[in-house]
UniProtKB/Swiss-Prot annotation:
Source organism of the structure: Dehalococcoides mccartyi (strain ATCC BAA-2266 / KCTC 15142 / 195) (Dehalococcoides ethenogenes (strain 195))
UniProt-listed NCBIfam families: DTMP_kinase (TIGR00041)
EC number(s) recorded for this UniProt protein: 2.7.4.9
GO molecular function: ATP binding; dTMP kinase activity
Gene name in the database record: tmk
Identification of the protein by name: Thymidylate kinase
Reaction(s) the record says it catalyses: dTMP + ATP = dTDP + ADP
Length: 207
């Protein structure tokens, strides 16, 4: 049974940790599963990621960010996500189109309809079956990053991160059946348990 699951949220909320935990769980059950991430997930996409997150030589406008994220996305979908789904796998993706809408739309202030249009073109209209939103206060989440050097997005001010968080809230409220909102301040084990329960229900597995 093919299934497309995405993880969303602000910086440091634990998306990578929980997406990996879900991947390990599904593989242990013997299910075909592919774990990937945005931006990046392919060699070409990883080059775009480095430009988006670490470029200090040139100014990258919000519109340029929008196109770069979606260029990376289109490559990932064509080379990883769609083939895996067609083969009947469960695909888990750390970030997807909702992040672009939250960051470049609500965070950067681009017209929301423009962001949605470009997202739709790049994704071919592919919508996740389940989106897990790990919600957390942005200040507390960024503290989790520790002493690692911040990238362009982590370096943004608190106002930006709050707009992104609010944006995720609006997006989730518009599609309540697709979203599972979880308090990311819960323990890792508690979050993993909640996620497993929802995924088991989708796959019609015993709880």
């Amino acid at each position: 049974m093919s299934l497309f699951i995405t993880f969303e949220g602000g910086e440091g909320c634990g998306k990578s940790t929980q997406s990996k935990a879900l991947y390990r769980y599904l593989k242990k059950l013997g299910l075909g599963c592919v774990l990937t991430h945005e931006p990046g997930g392919t060699r070409s996409g990883d080059k775009i990621t480095r430009l988006l997150k670490w470029s200090e030589e040139e100014n990258i406008s919000p519109l340029a960010e929008l196109f770069l994220f979606n260029a990376s996305r289109s490559i990932l979908i064509d080379n990883v996500i769609k083939p895996a789904l067609l083969d009947g796998n469960i695909v888990i993706c750390d970030r997807y189109t909702d992040s672009t809408l939250a960051y470049q739309g609500y965070g950067r202030g681009l017209e929301l309809d423009t962001v949605k249009c470009i997202n739709s073109l790049a994704s071919g209209g592919l919508v996740p079956d389940l989106t897990i939103w790990l919600d957390m206060d942005d200040k507390a989440a960024l503290l989790r990053k520790g002493k690692l050097p911040p990238d362009r997005f982590e370096s943004e001010n608190n106002g930006f991160h709050q707009r992104v968080r609010d944006g995720f809230g609006v997006i989730a409220a518009a599609e309540p059946n697709r979203f599972l909102k979880l308090d990311a301040s819960l323990s890792q084990s508690e979050l993993t348990k909640c996620i497993k329960q929802r995924v088991n229900a989708l796959l019609k597995l015993p709880q």
